[in-house]
UniProtKB/Swiss-Prot annotation:
Tissues showing expression: Expressed in the testis.
Compartments in which it is found: Cytoplasm; Cytoplasm, Cytoskeleton, Spindle; Cytoplasm, Cytoskeleton, Spindle pole
Subunit structure as annotated in this protein's UniProt entry: Interacts with FBXW7; promotes FBXW7 degradation. May interact with RAF1. Interacts with KIF22; recruits KIF22 to mitotic spindle microtubules. Interacts (via C-terminus) with DYNLL1. Interacts with HMMR. Directly interacts (via DUF1669) with CSNK1A1 and CSNK1A1L.
Induction: Up-regulated during mitosis.
Positions where Phosphothreonine occurs in the chain: 513
Entry GO CC: cytoplasm; cytosol; intercellular bridge; microtubule cytoskeleton; mitotic spindle; mitotic spindle pole; spindle
This protein's domain notes: All members of the FAM83 family of proteins share a conserved N-terminal DUF1669 (domain of unknown function 1669) domain of about 300 amino acids. This domain mediates the interaction with casein kinase 1 (CK1) isoforms. Therefore, it has been proposed to rename DUF1669 the polypeptide anchor of CK1 domain.
GO molecular function: kinesin binding; microtubule binding; protein kinase binding
GO biological process, one term: cell division
Gene behind this protein: FAM83D
Protein name: Protein FAM83D
Family listed: Belongs to the FAM83 family.
Entry keywords, A to Z: Cell cycle, Cell division, Cytoplasm, Cytoskeleton, Mitosis, Phosphoprotein, Proto-oncogene
Organism the protein comes from: Homo sapiens
Region (DUF1669): 1-299
Length: 585
């Protein structure tokens, strides 16, 4: 096997693909895997002997060799047994085993972001991508860029919702105090993921500051690791974390070679890149993946600090207690991220007198003529215009200091009210026309039975009554075509009664006289003229009404955006003059 792998390792560089997908030989080397197992099992001497025997180049420097030996955990060691016990207890506490072929660890649900997270859906636009670079040490002069530490602290202070930190080592006191102050005073949630191998340095800093990170209500500290290599002997090699980025509110991210240490902020040379916009979505996804793979602080590390009595609460803490204390905070956070501010409620200012007076007015409009009604209620309409305008406003609208969106809402409300008033006016005009036509028919019959022997007076009374009927029924009328049809039928009915009355068998003595024949011819001639005059007037009014209705319909459809439906009736007479007599130029 070693000879076969040697042939794979000695593939010339020309066979490797400089572009495109890498070859399998570039991704995996069996000889190097065997050399790594020799290093873990026998140490540096066995590793060097294997390289000489297989004629392999030295692919690990001495520092890497010592780092791998320190990171290796053998099955019989105390640390590996404690870690396995902790994992078993963690899995048994959740009791998520499905009893199928798959192992128990695949059935464990990932930890939740219990402190809240920005409500960005997948693919949501986060703005244009922008890049801002900082270097340590910073440039000379007042106009030089900020240092990495100063730029990072400035970004942390600008957070409003959440801060997510992924770091290898965290020992800077100033940055930790900034995060602690942001949690307590601004109510910003802070997630910290640290390398498991370097977590002891973070706990040493907290012990020196006499700070308990697990007691912070809006701060969570967990550990992550790099890739894990498993040898055939059962030994596993745990990789380190070299990812360094800080996610702020889901819209900005600070990444680079800068670590949260005093030496990187003052002595070491480092850089920091601040990204904003759509590129932050990738860092958002990466942090959620790392948080799902993270683990709480290991009891093994806490045992080293039990002698100082500063972290006793971490050993005996209950995970459920933190969830109970953060329940209300989580609801408030989710509500603030996903909901809009509520508008102030305004009490309707419409008095009860307006409602009480509206009913008798509606009853009178069906029996009294429009001229009398307008003359008796014109002053009252002018006094009630302000009150009706106030009642048309919805109670959810905020009247003082309106914004642009609220003005658009009131415009749509005014449109709905105008459409409501036009529809109800049509019904009132049709009911008045029908009532007056019936009363006119009754008066005409009475005039014929009583005043017909006088001749001239009876014939002159009928056209006048018909004129009054036609004028009262069609003047100031903005109803539909059906209401005008009722007017035409009402005016035509007295004329038909008049023509049949001349042939009534109750008056045979007048048919043979010459004066009666002249009178009949003149009256018929006048009746035809009056009939033509009335028909022409009715036709012109109908044409005018159809034109007015067509223009009004076009206006409401194009400009008001009126929708059909049932509307509530509000003060119809306040806009009657405008609706019935528009000025067309």
């Amino acid at each position: 096997m070693a000879l076969l792998s040697e042939g794979l390792d000695e593939v010339p560089a020309a066979c490797l693909s400089p572009c495109g997908p890498p070859n399998p030989t570039e991704l995996f080397s069996e000889s190097r895997r065997l050399a790594l197992e020799e290093l873990v099992a026998g140490g540096p001497e066995a590793f060097a002997a294997f390289l000489r025997r297989e004629r392999l180049a030295r692919f690990l420097n001495p520092d890497e060799v010592h780092a791998i030996l320190r990171a290796a955990e053998r099955p019989g060691e105390e640390g590996a047994a404690a870690a396995a016990a902790a994992e078993d207890s963690f899995g048994s506490s959740h009791d998520c085993s499905s009893g199928t072929y798959f192992p128990e660890q695949s059935d464990l649900e990932p930890p939740l972001l219990e402190l809240g997270w920005p409500a960005f859906y997948q693919g949501a636009y986060r703005g244009a991508t922008r890049v801002e670079t900082h270097f340590q040490p910073r440039g000379a002069g007042e106009g030089g860029p900020y240092g990495c530490k100063d730029a990072l602290r400035q970004q942390l202070r600008s957070a409003r919702e959440v801060i997510a930190v992924v770091m290898d080592v965290f020992t800077d006191i100033d940055i930790f105090r900034d995060l602690q102050e942001i949690c307590r005073k601004q109510g910003v949630a802070v997630y910290i993921l640290l390398d498991q191998a370097l977590l002891s340095q973070f706990l040493d800093m907290c012990m020196d500051l006499k700070v308990h990170p697990e007691q912070e209500k809006l701060m969570t500290v967990r550990t992550i690791t790099g890739n894990i290599y498993y040898a055939r002997s059962g030994t596993k090699i745990i990789g380190k974390v070299h990812e360094k980025f800080t996610l702020i509110d889901g819209i900005r991210v600070a990444t680079g070679s800068y670590s949260f240490t005093w030496t990187d902020g003052k002595l070491n040379s480092s850089n920091l890149v601040i990204l904003s916009g759509q590129v932050v979505e990738h860092f958002d996804l990466e942090f959620r993946i790392l948080y799902a793979q993270s683990k709480p602080i290991s009891p093994k590390l806490l045992s080293h600090f039990q002698s100082s009595n500063k972290f006793d609460h971490l050993t005996n803490r209950k995970p459920q207690s933190k969830e109970l204390t953060l329940g209300n905070l989580l609801r408030m956070r989710l509500a603030r991220l996903s909901s809009t501010p509520r508008k102030a409620d305004l009490d309707p200012e419409m008095p009860a007198e307006g409602k009480a007076e509206r009913k008798p007015h509606d009853c009178e409009s069906s029996t009294v003529s429009e001229e009398d009604y307008f003359s008796s209620h014109r002053d009252e309409l002018q006094s009630r215009k302000a009150i009706d305008a106030a009642t048309q406003t919805e109670p959810g609208e905020e009247m003082p200091g309106l914004s642009v969106s609220e003005v658009g809402t009131q415009t749509s409300i005014t449109t709905a009210c105008a459409g409501t008033q036009t529809a109800v006016i049509t019904r009132i005009a049709s009911s008045q026309t029908t009532i007056w036509s019936r009363s006119t028919t009754t008066q005409t019959d009475m005039d014929e039975n009583i005043l017909f022997p006088r001749g001239t007076q009876s014939t002159e009374g009928s056209p006048v009554s018909k004129m009054s009927v036609s004028r009262s029924s069609s003047l100031k009328s903005s109803s539909s075509v059906s209401s005008q049809g009722s007017v035409a039928s009402s005016t035509g009915s007295p004329a038909s009664i008049r023509t049949t009355d001349f042939h009534n068998p109750g008056y045979p003595k007048y048919l043979g006289t010459p004066h009666l024949e002249l009178y009949l011819s003149d009256s018929l001639r006048n009746l035809n003229k009056e009939r033509q005059f009335h028909f022409a007037g009715i036709r012109s009014r109908l044409n005018h009404m159809l034109a007015m209705l067509s223009r009004r319909t076009l206006f409401t459809e194009n400009h008001l955006g009126l929708h059909s439906g049932n509307f509530s009736r509000v003060n119809l007479l306040a806009v009657r003059d405008v609706a019935l007599y528009p000025s067309y130029q």
